[in-house]
Regions:
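Metal-dependent phosphoester/phosphodiester hydrolase catalytic core
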Residues: 2-14, 21-508
Length: 508
């Protein structure tokens, strides 16, 4: 069915391109490239190029209900003196006039520049980078990861700084949009009600995409994206959700959220949504240096066994049938670990693996939406990391609007349990507002959770640099997001050495 849907979409685009009337874009009196450009899902010979045509982005786009002819160019230089590839495609009204160009035939491990054109208007120029050849020696990879960008809670200043970081790729770990209606008194305002329909989700994505700092980050390098919950509904789990609506209503809502997500992300046709389903977990290899296993902990999970919120785990948290990944994704991950020959193996995913205990003393209060609510599934994952003797496993996590560095163990209660991996938890871009450096209960939190090496509650992102001998993580933080001019600084740096699980703080 997926292949048939992909082929049908490609055939529809080809027919629309042939039928598109000449000179159609002369009707447009203002820019159609209001949402910028992006690239993503790189391969050794290509990437996905993205844009969406919209005259009035937050009012459904205001484009005519017809296909639009879009030309694209890929160059070896930023002046477009040496064209590597070029072509035409159709932006279809059925897909909100979004454009997804899947490139091939490019050289591995190099930068390219790209742009789109509708009639006489050129889009902004974007830059993308191909992956190295499979198994090729790679000495360095510099990337960032980010998550949780609630538009109302602050300015996307972090992305302005990120666009100047000289990164090969950015991993976005979810909560790219938030689904709630406008809340009075916040820094910026959502437009429209709580998201329910396809038009709602399209307009919210478009509102976020109009932000110039977010556009700059997307234009600077490719993004590899995955989602968390707010792309559809807070803390949803497969077809379970907090409103309690009939499953048929939520299925339609999830399908709307998934389609709008695809329309606004640089994803390949293999991720083309099929109703309320979308294939998002996938693997990327940077030569022999690093493999990235991008996970989806929302679409296939069972409902939270102990309910939502922070509480003492119930018996259901230890149910072996409870899962965040689903059996098929667990098998895919196990097979990937078995075949990986990379020196570093990185898991970009959504929710915290380490069990952060919020209660002092013998009582235990854990987040039931995180891996702590699915403890048998967490044990399976950590045992898999240990049993496969995977080269240097590192987990990248978002969701919690705070920075952490955690040692991961199969048994967190046993001080003698060996460290099997490192978890780098990145804070939010804006969610939670300005934040603070250290919470008042930091000493108690560290005492209750000795596997935590670092904790901070400012906004920002994490920049990582991987080499054959070590991986370094720099925690980049902003002083505030309630105003758009915050400087950025490195709050802390940690290093994971080759063959030595666990992170060590670097002196600053």
């Amino acid at each position: 069915m997926f292949l048939a849907n992909s082929l049908a979409l490609a055939a529809l685009a080809r027919r629309a391109l042939l039928a598109a009337p000449a000179g159609q874009a002369s009707r447009f009196s203002s820019s159609v490239f209001t949402l910028g450009v992006a690239s993503g899902d790189p391969s050794p010979d290509g990437a996905v190029l993205w844009t969406r045509l919209a005259l009035d982005p937050t009012a459904g786009g205001a484009m005519p209900p017809t296909p639009i002819d879009v030309q694209w160019e890929v160059a070896r230089d930023e002046r477009f003196a040496s064209i590597a590839r070029q072509g035409r495609t159709a932006a279809l009204p059925e897909w909100a006039h979004s454009v997804h160009v899947e490139l091939d035939g490019l050289e591995p491990d190099r930068w390219y520049w790209y742009r789109f054109r509708v009639n006489d208007e050129h889009s902004p120029v974007g830059r993308t980078r191909t992956l190295p050849r499979a198994g090729a020696p790679v000495n360095q990879l510099r990337f960032a990861f980010a998550s949780c960008q609630q538009y109302e809670m602050g300015y996307f200043t972090a992305y302005r700084h990120m666009s100047a970081e000289d990164l090969s790729v950015v991993f976005h770990l979810g909560d790219y949009i938030y689904e709630g209606a406008a809340t009075a008194g916040r820094v910026r305002q959502h437009l429209g009600p709580e998201l329910m329909t396809l038009d709602d989700y399209r307009n919210r994505h478009a509102q976020y995409r109009t932000d110039p700092d977010l556009q700059a980050a997307h234009a600077a390098c490719p993004f590899i994206v995955t989602w968390d919950d707010h792309e559809v509904d807070n803390n949803y789990a497969a077809m379970s959700h907090e409103r309690g609506d009939p499953i048929e209503l939520f299925e339609r809502r999830r399908a709307a959220g998934y389609k709008a997500y695809y329309e606004h992300m640089p994803l390949r046709t293999r991720s083309l949504p099929r109703g309320a389903s979308l294939q998002l977990y996938r693997r990327f290899a940077y030569g022999s240096l690093a493999s990235f296993f991008v996970l989806d902990t929302r679409q296939f999970r069972t409902d939270q066994p102990c309910g939502d919120g922070v509480r003492t785990p119930c018996r259901g948290a230890f149910d072996e049938k409870a899962t965040l990944l689903g059996l098929e994704q667990e098998r895919w991950l196990s097979d990937g670990f078995t075949t990986s020959k990379s020196r570093w193996n990185v898991l970009p995913q959504q929710v915290m693996i380490a069990p952060i205990d919020r209660a002092e003393g013998p009582d235990e209060r854990l987040s039931m939406d995180q891996w702590s609510g699915y403890q048998s599934a967490r044990t399976r994952l950590l045992q898999l990391l240990a049993r496969r003797r995977l080269g240097n496993p590192v987990v990248l996590t978002g969701d919690v609007h705070s920075n952490y560095v955690n040692d991961l163990k199969i048994d967190f209660r046993d001080p003698k349990s060996p460290v099997v991996a490192t978890e780098l938890v990145g804070t939010s871009i804006t969610s939670g507002g300005d934040g603070i450096d250290e919470p008042g209960n930091l000493s108690a939190l560290l005492a209750e959770n000795p596997f935590v090496k670092f904790h901070n509650e400012q906004r920002g992102y994490v920049v990582c640099e991987i080499g054959p001998k070590a991986m370094q993580a720099d925690y980049r933080v902003l002083d505030y997001v309630s105003r758009p001019d915050s400087p950025i600084r490195t709050r802390a740096s940690f290093i994971v050495e080759d063959g030595r699980p666990g992170a060590q703080a670097l002196k600053r």
